[in-house]
């Protein structure tokens, strides 16, 4: 299986979610199922069916997280420098609107565009990889063709 690139903070966040699911959510849902079972006939017991559905979701998420974490290739951006690569925090200016944007290029499981965390597999990240400060890049986005100039690259 292919390794999954991830920052240390992304890895820690997924580990914390896994711990929460295993130590808090799973025991709570087992207790809820047991309580619902005590109410009698399971065929018409909405609480029981709801709890079982939630248990299925929790177990699926635990399995997914364990798989992702087992394949994680944790890359510490503070040890990197130079042209843009995984982990870089990149400040760009839109050449059409002069709007500045800062994104950090991260793995797909930690990406969150609202928090400035850009999936390495996204069109913008793929266009930026290997580029340097001062370079211009053309990116085909869902909103149309965009031109960006790279203002700065940081690894922190």
Curated annotation (Swiss-Prot):
Superkingdom, natural source: Bacteria
A biological process term (GO) from this entry: DNA-templated transcription elongation
MF terms in GO: DNA binding; RNA polymerase binding
PANTHER family: TRANSCRIPTION ELONGATION FACTOR GREA
Gene3D superfamilies xref list: Transcription elongation factor, GreA/GreB, C-terminal domain, Transcription elongation factor, GreA/GreB, N-terminal domain
PROSITE patterns with a match to the protein in the record: GREAB_1
Protein source organism: Ruegeria pomeroyi (strain ATCC 700808 / DSM 15171 / DSS-3)
UniProt family annotation: Belongs to the GreA/GreB family.
Pfam families linked: GreA_GreB, GreA_GreB_N
HAMAP family, per database record: GreA_GreB
Keyword match Coiled coil: yes
Chain segments annotated as coiled-coil in the UniProt record: 46-66
Entry function: Necessary for efficient RNA polymerase transcription elongation past template-encoded arresting sites. The arresting sites in DNA have the property of trapping a certain fraction of elongating RNA polymerases that pass through, resulting in locked ternary complexes. Cleavage of the nascent transcript by cleavage factors such as GreA or GreB allows the resumption of elongation from the new 3'terminus. GreA releases sequences of 2 to 3 nucleotides.
UniProt-recorded name of the protein: Transcription elongation factor GreA
Alphabetic keyword roster: Coiled coil, DNA-binding, Transcription, Transcription regulation
InterPro entries: GreA/GreB_C_sf, TF_GreA/GreB_CS, Tscrpt_elong_fac_GreA, Tscrpt_elong_fac_GreA/B, Tscrpt_elong_fac_GreA/B_C, Tscrpt_elong_fac_GreA/B_fam, Tscrpt_elong_fac_GreA/B_N, Tscrpt_elong_fac_GreA/B_N_sf
Keyword Protease: no
């Amino acid at each position: 299986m292919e390794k999954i690139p991830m920052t240390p903070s992304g890895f820690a966040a997924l580990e914390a979610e896994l711990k929460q699911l295993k130590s808090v959510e799973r025991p709570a849902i087992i207790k809820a199922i047991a309580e619902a079972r005590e109410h009698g006939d399971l065929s018409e017991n909405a609480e029981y069916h709801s709890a079982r559905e939630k248990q299925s979701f929790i177990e699926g998420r635990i399995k997914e997280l364990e798989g992702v974490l087992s394949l994680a290739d944790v890359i510490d951006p503070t040890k990197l420098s130079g042209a843009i690569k995984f982990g870089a925090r990149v400040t760009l200016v839109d050449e059409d609107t002069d709007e500045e944007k800062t994104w950090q290029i991260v793995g797909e499981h930690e990406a969150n565009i609202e928090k400035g965390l850009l999936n390495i597999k996204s069109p913008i990240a793929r266009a930026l990889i290997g580029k340097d400060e001062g370079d211009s890049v053309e990116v085909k986005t869902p909103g149309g063709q965009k031109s960006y100039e790279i203002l700065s690259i940081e690894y922190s």
